[in-house]
């Protein structure tokens, strides 16, 4: 089985290695991502999936290998470099300021100002309403602190922030963790909307069911190495479980 995608990937991590104190956390791993695609990264704690993706978000630096964005080699040394390549990360903690409303969170650190140099709260709220109308039309709580929002609504704000600032590559860390069924469905619909807009999404996950529901492809890592990549529609939960636990590659993997 081969990669079903053709053309130039949005991003390609090629032969990446990362070591800490002589221990290889990531050992010659390659993975790619195409526009309008969700790729799940799975593996036990310590498998290396988060470490691998953090070299794309700028949190870690690779020791070897290449990062290509739209087919061109890119140097990513910190999160600012990543944002310069339209890469945004949504961490499990969401990094939201609980005491601020949706608009203040969306523009936190990147506030809009008027011609006098003052923060333009009216314009920020209007822009927030516009982007939320696109992503989550049911969102109505614009004037309350995000601490008063549900988990799915908070996730909506974090996603809107990334999309507003022109993310083309989105890294999501267990976006449905600790959410109920209704909230999980809300996030699933958000992800489908982002796919339709041509974004590429890396989903760091532990939950196989979430991967089967949300992802197009799944890459499994074990002990810092890539076990294989599968097209989700071609495999079962048990196939992926075997890759995670045993490092066993099904015939459909590549």
Where are these regions (language model features)?
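Glycine-rich phosphate-binding loops of nucleotide-dependent enzymes
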Residues: 2-254
């Amino acid at each position: 089985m081969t990669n079903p995608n053709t053309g130039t990937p949005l991003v390609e991590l090629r032969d990446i290695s990362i070591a800490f104190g002589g221990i290889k956390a990531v050992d010659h791993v390659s993975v790619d991502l195409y526009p309008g695609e969700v790729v799940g990264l799975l593996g036990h704690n310590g498998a290396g999936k988060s470490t691998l993706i953090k070299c794309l978000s700028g949190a870690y630096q690779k020791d070897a290998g290449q990062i290509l964005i739209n087919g061109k080699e890119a140097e990513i040394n910190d999160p600012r470099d990543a944002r310069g390549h339209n890469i945004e990360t949504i961490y499990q903690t969401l990094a939201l300021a609980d005491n601020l409303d949706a608009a203040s969170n969306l523009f936190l650190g990147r506030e809009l100002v008027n011609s006098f140099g003052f923060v333009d709260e009216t314009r920020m709220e209007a822009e927030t309403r516009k982007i939320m109308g696109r992503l989550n039309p049911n969102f109505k709580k614009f004037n309350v602190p995000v601490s008063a929002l549900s988990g799915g609504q908070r996730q909506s704000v974090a996603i809107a922030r990334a999309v507003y600032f022109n993310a083309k590559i989105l890294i999501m860390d267990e976006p449905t963790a600790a959410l109920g069924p209704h909230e999980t469905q809300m996030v699933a619909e958000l992800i489908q909307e982002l796919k339709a807009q041509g974004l590429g999404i890396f989903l760091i996950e532990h939950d196989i069911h979430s991967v089967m529901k949300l992802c197009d492809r799944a890459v499994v890592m074990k002990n810092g190495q890539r076990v294989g990549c599968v097209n989700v529609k071609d495999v079962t939960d048990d196939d992926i479980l075997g890759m995670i636990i045993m490092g066993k590659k099904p015939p459909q993997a590549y």
